[in-house]
Structure formats: structure tokens, C-alpha cells
Amino acid sequence: MGQLLIFGLGYTAGRIATAMHAHGWQVRATGSAGDIAFGDRGAVLAALGEATHILSSVSPERAGGDPVLEAYGEALAGADKRGALFYLSSTGVYGDRAGAWVDETTPTIAEAGEGRRNARAEADLAWLTMGARVFRLPGIYGPGRSALDRVKEGKARRIDLPNQVFSRVHVDDIASGVVAALVHDAPAGAYNLGDDLPCSGNEVTEHACRLLGFPLPLLETLEEANLSEMARGFYMENRRVSNGKAKRVLGWSPRYPTYVEGLAALL
């Protein structure tokens, strides 16, 4: 069986680690929940030498580069791990597409040279250049992190943006997609892992309210919502993400094809 080294054992990577343990793999990881300190260079290099596969879920610095590639990129390249690199990226690399569909052939912000610097898109391209399998993820939800939780906590919002759509994915569907790629030695390249139904965030919030018997939050304009810069940026992008390649190449399909099944499983 394989040995997986994970950089950044967080919410999503933790689910992947659990799934790989179930497949009989050995898993080591950096991060607060891992067994190796990211800054312990000797320990990390030793783990890199032993690992058959490497997965990074570490996001790039907002105004800087990718921490993993900056610290260990040379070691990754020199250790001949090109056929065993995996990276969790974001569908945000596609930028705003005015509601149009995007797939893995759609140029990213970095590839299109759109002028504005985007650390995530640049990291995405850097990992692809190294021969990695790059998983582009939309909005992630799952236990403890869903519209149900936001409604119960009084944090749910409804923003009045007609025709605004987002894609999303259940965290366990990310895990199953990455596991399929790890176990079956998927070809290098980008893979979108999202569900089958891009839709407005309001639609999901309203369904969550119905499931819980809660009243709907007030409908607000973007200005009235007084969102943080990060949250506001989220609403400035509008796209539908195709998952066709992951289905064809990985033999993957989401267990929760829409938010309806996903939220029902979280009740």
C-alpha cells in the first residue's frame, strides 16, 4: 500500500486522510492535527523521502507565494515525485464568468494573464507545471460547515443578486474524488470536483430554513449586507463549474449530487 504525506491536515484533508487509512495506506501530515511540524525541515524531508504520494491543501499567502513550494519545492522536484503530487486548489482560479459554464479547458486568471495578481491561480499553475493532479474545488460544505449551521447560528444571509449562481461540493465527495485519483493513479492535470447543480446561495439558504422550520433571513442588497472584503469578493464572481472530466477520467460521481441530498444527510 502507499504512503501519503499531507501538507496541511485541515477540514478537507482530514477527510481524505481518514479515507486513505480505510484503504490501508499510511498517512503522515503537517498541521495542528498532524504529526510533523511544517517548519521541522529534517522531519519533513525524511517524510518526503518515505512518501509514495504527496498532497498539499495549504493555501497560498494572500500577497505571496505557495508556502509548500517555497519551503520544499526544490526537494519535491529533486525527489522525483512528479508522478505522485496532488494539490487542492479552488474554482476561484477561473475568475468571474458572468454565470457561464467553466471546465478544465477554461483559461485560469494566471493562464489568461488578466493583469491582476491572484496567488491561488499562480499556485494552481505552479503545481500543474510540476505534474500534479490539481483538484479545483468550489464552495465546500459538510458536518459543522453548512447552510444548516449558518441558519441555526443566525448567520445565514440572503443577498439580492438576480442570476447569481455558485457551485458547491460536499466534503466527502471531495474525499472520494481525491481517493479515486490516488488509488487509480489518475493522469496529471486539473480536475473540477463539484456537484451537479450550480445555483444561487439564496436557494440553498431557503431550503435549509424549510428543513429546520426557521424563518427566512431578510433579503438584502450587497451594500446593505455590509460584508467583509473577502465575503464581498465571493459575491462578485458568478460561474457554473462542470464536473464532467472528473466523472469521465476518475470514474467519480458525487454521492450528494445536489444540495438537497447533501443537506438531508447533515440533519
Which residues does each PLM region occupy?
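NAD(P)-cofactor binding segment of oxidoreductase domains
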Residues: 49-88, 93, 125
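Conserved C-terminal active-site "lid" loop/helix of NAD(P)H-dependent oxidoreductases
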Residues: 206, 225-253
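Active-site "gating" loop of Rossmann-like NAD(P)-dependent oxidoreductase/epimerase domains
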Residues: 91-114
